[in-house]
A protein has these predicted regions:
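Beta-strand-enriched, solvent-exposed domains that form extended recognition/catalytic surfaces
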Residues: 25-152
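Catalytic Zn2+-binding segment of zinc metalloproteases
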Residues: 313-329
Length: 425
């Protein structure tokens, strides 16, 4: 297995060295693409909403036609004239999660989704695909982008939201740019927001591998003001006017704090270089969520704020799965047991060799008994991805399993490190 891993790494090094040059195909600007994902549990569709141009590109300028993770959706950009693939990215969405709910069996809905792509120099074809938990195509949509289109909305040239850098290690093209956005903070509460953003930053960089790779990041706190203080709690009939319209009770789950108004997030960030997003909610009620390559959203004043913001960023930044599970429950709608999940920290053993098999010490029992966790810090422990049976995690405990544990397990640390190195070699 070690030989296979070395071969894979050499392949990526070779591919990267012979990949197209960013400047051959792209301007130093961002193409923001807004979509609407619609449908129900039976049928899904994708519709183009709007195209926008942002003043600069903060994303990667290498590994352009490669994916770090499969995700639940993918975007492929091709040069229209040559049909050469010039950019790829992957993602997950709140829409994907909603499709597994009872509500999706009874009604159809639409969800906003926004993605950032490098702005092409020449006409390009964009293809976006949504995948089921079985990795089958649910919906696919193609459209053209003509860079001289006068209806591409120019954003971020003025009326930029006030912001302050908490960490700046270099130009946006040389670092991973994370924006921390205020939600439920009034103009008079922005000093509190900046303090909370500092706390989130401090917590993130107290965890490996973020701590040792801190110089790869820029962190900017964005003071997006809300009319009302706090966030909406529908079960208590509290609806507030806030910057990104977040609320608890997502999918009727008390603690699930999200927003479906994705465009409001990106509108608040227009004109500020960013790739990844953390939203801090001005409330002491426990809750939050993290969606791969979409956003992290968490409450800022609950005692568990610091571990939760790191856990949720593990989802949104590195595509890590939840390692906790419910006794006597198997959620096969989320993770079918005959399909290997794309997340790097759980396995159904369908393709365990693609996960952390190479990290197991010789003699590690497969599966690893729960009472042997002290002897085997890395193993194959049953229970993860919300299911007590059939899904396995790498360690007895981890930041992706409980709030009380102090760090990411070695497998999650490697997964995060690989993502960082993919973005910033």
């Amino acid at each position: 297995m070690k030989q296979i891993c070395c071969t894979i790494l050499l392949f990526f090094a070779f591919a990267g060295s012979h990949a197209q040059d960013f400047a051959d195909y792209f301007q130093n600007k961002t193409l923001r693409v807004d979509y609407i994902f619609t449908g129900n549990a039976e049928r899904q569709n994708i519709y183009l909403d709007e195209l926008s141009q942002l003043p600069s590109w903060a994303g990667r300028q290498h590994h352009l036609s490669e994916l770090p993770l499969e995700g639940n959706g993918q975007i492929i950009v091709k040069d229209l004239a040559t049909q050469q693939t010039i950019y790829k990215t992957s993602f997950s969405s709140l829409f994907h999660e909603w499709l597994s709910t009872d509500e999706a069996k009874e009604t159809a809905k639409g969800f906003e989704n926004t993605f950032l792509l490098p702005f092409p120099k020449q006409p390009a074809e964009v293809e976006i695909s949504l995948y089921s938990p079985r990795k089958e195509v649910m919906a696919r949509y193609k459209h053209l982008v003509r860079p001289d289109d006068i209806l591409i909305h120019q954003r971020g040239m003025s009326h930029v939201t006030p912001h302050r850098y908490l960490l700046r290690n270099g130009n946006e093209k040389d670092c991973i740019d994370v924006a921390i956005l205020a939600e439920g903070y009034t103009d008079k509460e922005m000093d509190l927001f900046y303090q909370d953003a500092e706390s989130a930053c401090e917590s993130l960089f107290s965890h490996e591998p973020f701590r040792s790779m801190k110089d790869k990041f820029n962190i900017v706190a964005v003071a997006s003001p809300s009319t009302d203080s706090g966030v909406s709690v529908p079960r208590e009939n509290q609806w507030k006017q806030t910057a990104v319209h977040s609320h608890f009770d997502t999918f009727y789950s008390d603690r699930y704090l999200t927003t479906s108004r994705i465009k409001s997030i990106h509108n608040a960030l227009a004109g500020i270089p960013y790739e990844h997003i953390i939203i801090l909610a001005n409330t002491d009620v426990y809750g939050g969520g993290g969606i791969y390559n979409s956003y992290t959203l968490t409450t800022a004043h609950h005692p568990m704020f610091k571990p939760v913001v790191v856990h949720e960023f593990g989802h949104s930044f590195a595509g890590l799965a939840d390692e906790y599970f419910y006794e006597n429950d198997t959620m096969t709608d989320t993770y079918p047991l005959d399909v290997e999940p794309w997340e790097q920290n759980i396995s159904t053993r369908v393709d365990f060799s693609s996960k952390w098999e190479d990290l197991l010490p010789a003699g590690t029992p497969i599966p690893t008994p729960a009472n042997k966790w002290e002897k085997f810090p890395i193993g194959l422990y049953e229970g993860g991805g919300y299911s007590a049976k059939g899904i396995y995690r790498p360690a007895h405990n981890c930041r992706m399993k409980t709030n009380e544990y102090k760090e990411f397990c070695p497998v999650c640390q490697r997964a995060i490190r690989r993502i960082i190195e993919f973005y910033v070699p």
